[in-house]
């Protein structure tokens, strides 16, 4: 993986939870010199595990991660057992930000008072629906690189199995049924279920102040609506509102 630094500041990339040589771990000043502006660094390793993983800056983390330098990686097993097969495979990155009134850039100095909570860099109603057919077997991969908050992710209308953590896929005997799964900061969780009921079903964090930030309240059901329409309507009330991302 070639990483070219187009920032005005040094950076690195850390491959979170991945088994790799020490020199490829991406911690600036410890396992490698930071990548200077304009430079390219090659990260190289042999993939020895499958699962859901994340990557993020590991240099001036408070600033660079708070500005969105993060993402997800999925390593599929070379030989997939039957129980691994799904019809729909989704990935959602959970994050949080501080956006002051009248601004469009997150405040990287905030430590606890976050007011925008996002799923894959968007907050409701700018989030994309997870579309599936009745009877589909669905996997949702959840990763949390929020600065300070865990998220208890709840699915309406169905129960699911927790099938994997950032330590890898769980043996069938260790998987458990749930309707809500806690995704701690720096962790991943895979959940799997059968789409057994028709309809638009919410998927949200169940911490109430997180729910109020992005899910459902006082608005029509916008699971499959065009993002621009509700955004314009909300701006009539809150002039500085924007669907993040």
Model-identified regions with their sequence ranges:
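Copper-binding active sites and cupredoxin-like electron-transfer domains
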Residues: 1-245
């Amino acid at each position: 993986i070639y990483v070219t630094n187009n920032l005005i500041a040094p950076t690195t990339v850390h491959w979170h939870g991945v088994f790799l040589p020490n020199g490829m771990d991406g911690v600036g000043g410890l396992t490698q010199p930071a990548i200077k502006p304009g430079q390219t660094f090659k990260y190289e390793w042999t993939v020895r595990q499958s699962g859901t993983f994340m990557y993020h800056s590991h240099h001036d983390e408070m600033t660079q991660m708070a500005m969105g330098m993060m993402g997800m990686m999925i390593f599929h097993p070379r030989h997939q057992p039957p129980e691994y097969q799904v019809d729909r495979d989704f990935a959602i990155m959970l994050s949080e930000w501080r956006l002051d009134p009248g601004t469009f850039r997150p405040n990287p100095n905030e430590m606890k008072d976050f007011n925008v909570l996002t799923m894959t860099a968007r907050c409701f109603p700018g989030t994309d629906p997870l579309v599936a057919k009745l009877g589909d077997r669905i996997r949702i991969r959840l990763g949390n690189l929020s600065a300070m908050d865990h998220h208890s992710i709840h699915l309406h209308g169905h129960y699911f199995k927790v099938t994997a953590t950032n330590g890898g896929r769980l043996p069938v005997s260790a998987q458990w049924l749930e309707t809500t799964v806690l995704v701690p900061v720096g962790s991943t969780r895979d959940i799997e279920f059968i789409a057994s009921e028709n309809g638009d079903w919410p998927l949200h964090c169940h911490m109430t102040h997180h729910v109020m930030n992005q899910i459902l309240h006082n608005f029509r059901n916008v699971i499959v609506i065009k993002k621009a329409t509700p955004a314009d309507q909300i701006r009539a009330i809150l002039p500085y509102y924007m669907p993040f991302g």
